[in-house]
A protein has these predicted regions:
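Extended, beta-strand-rich, solvent-exposed assembly scaffolds of outer structural proteins
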Residues: 132-189
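Glycine-enriched, solvent-exposed interface loops adjoining structured elements
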Residues: 1-123, 135, 150-152, 159, ...
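Acidic (Asp/Glu) carboxylate-rich active-site/surface patches
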Residues: 127
Length: 293
C-alpha cells in the first residue's frame, strides 16, 4: 500500500490510526474475493431437535457447490446415510408451512438472520499480552466452539482496558486470537471483563424443523478472506494478487484525502487484477476433467 502513495500521502498515512489502515486493506481484500469468488471454506452445522434456522459464519458470502443440474446443494448426514438438500427460496418454504419435525430436509434457504445475535459476556481466566499485534483471550468457563459459538470477524471488547477489535481465529473451546485497538494496553489481563458481538448475518433455514439432535449439515461456501489486523497476518491468496488489493486500499485512502486522480489510477489497477484472475479461472474451468459430475 505504501508503494502506491507519494511522499506527502505516506506521511499522512503514518498519522492515521493503525486500525483504519487494516480496515482499508481488509475492505479491499473482501471486495476482491466477492468479485472473483476465489476463496472457499466448509462449515459443519449440528442439528438441534425442533430447530429450523442455523447460523452461518460471519465470513459467509454465498454458497459454492452445485450438483450436475446446476442446483446449489449441501450435505446432510444422519449418522448412517447422506442426503443432498437443494437450495430454494424462503418464499417457497414459508408457503409450504411444514411445522412438524422431519427426519431430514429436502430443501433449504439462505436468509438474513432472523434475530439479533445475543452478546457473549465473560471474564478472562488468564492474561493475554499483546504480541505482534495479537493477544489471546482465554476463558475456561466458555465453549467457543459450541454453546458460546464464536467465528473470526466477530467483534470483541475488553471492558477493563477500554479497547475493542476483532476475533482473528478460534484456537479451541476456551481460547481466541484477537486484535485490539484504542485501549490502554490493547491486551487482556487476568480477570478482565469482555463482550463479544457476533457478526453473523446469514442463516441456513431448513424446509422443516429438525427431528433429531446431532445430525450434521456440511455447507461449502464462498468466504471472505481471513481478517488481517496484526503484524504477521496474511491472506489465503496467491501473492501475485496482493498488489492489486494494496492498490485498492490506496484508492480508499486517496479518495478520502481528495486525491481523486491518483485514486482512480489505483482503482483501475485493482479492476485489472480482478479481470486477470477471472481469465485464469475461466481457463482452468476449460481444462480436461474440470466439468461437474
Amino acid at each position: 500500500m505504501l508503494d502506491a502513495l507519494d511522499a506527502p500521502q505516506k506521511d499522512e498515512l503514518f498519522h492515521t490510526d493503525e486500525r483504519t489502515l487494516y480496515q482499508y486493506l481488509d475492505r479491499a481484500a473482501v471486495d476482491f474475493v466477492r468479485e472473483t469468488r476465489c476463496l472457499t471454506k466448509t462449515v459443519v452445522l449440528t442439528t438441534v431437535a425442533a430447530q429450523q434456522a442455523y447460523d452461518l459464519p460471519a465470513d459467509f458470502i454465498e454458497l459454492y457447490l452445485k450438483n450436475r443440474n446446476d442446483r446449489f446443494t449441501v450435505k446432510y448426514y444422519d449418522g448412517s446415510d447422506y442426503f443432498w438438500p437443494l437450495l430454494t427460496s424462503f418464499d417457497r418454504i414459508f408457503r409450504g408451512n411444514l411445522t412438524d419435525n422431519q427426519d431430514y430436509p429436502l430443501r433449504f434457504a439462505i436468509i438474513d438472520k432472523l434475530s439479533q445475535p445475543a452478546l457473549i459476556n465473560g471474564t478472562t481466566t488468564a492474561a493475554g499480552a499483546k504480541t505482534a499485534g495479537q493477544c489471546i483471550l482465554t476463558d475456561g468457563a466458555k465453549a467457543f466452539l459450541t454453546t458460546n459459538l464464536v467465528y473470526p470477524r466477530d467483534v470483541v471488547h475488553n471492558v477493563a482496558d477500554k479497547s475493542d477489535g476483532l476475533v482473528l481465529s478460534v484456537t479451541d473451546a476456551t481460547h481466541l486470537v484477537t486484535a485490539l485497538f484504542t485501549g490502554k494496553k490493547n491486551a487482556f489481563g487476568n480477570g478482565d471483563s469482555y463482550v463479544i458481538q457476533r457478526a453473523t448475518a446469514k442463516q441456513l433455514y431448513l424446509d422443516a424443523p429438525s427431528e433429531t439432535d446431532g445430525h450434521t449439515i456440511t455447507v461449502p461456501y464462498i468466504c471472505m478472506p481471513d481478517p488481517v489486523y496484526s503484524d504477521y497476518g496474511f491472506w489465503r491468496l496467491p501473492a501475485t494478487y496482493c498488489h492489486g488489493i494494496a492498490c485498492e486500499a490506496a484508492f480508499l485512502f486517496q479518495n478520502r484525502e481528495g486525491d481523486y486522480v491518483s485514486a482512480d489510477r489505483h482503482h483501475i489497477l485493482f479492476t485489472q487484477e480482478i479481470r486477470r484472475m477471472r481469465s485464469e479461472q475461466a481457463r482452468a474451468a476449460l481444462q480436461p476433467g474440470a466439468g461437474r459430475y
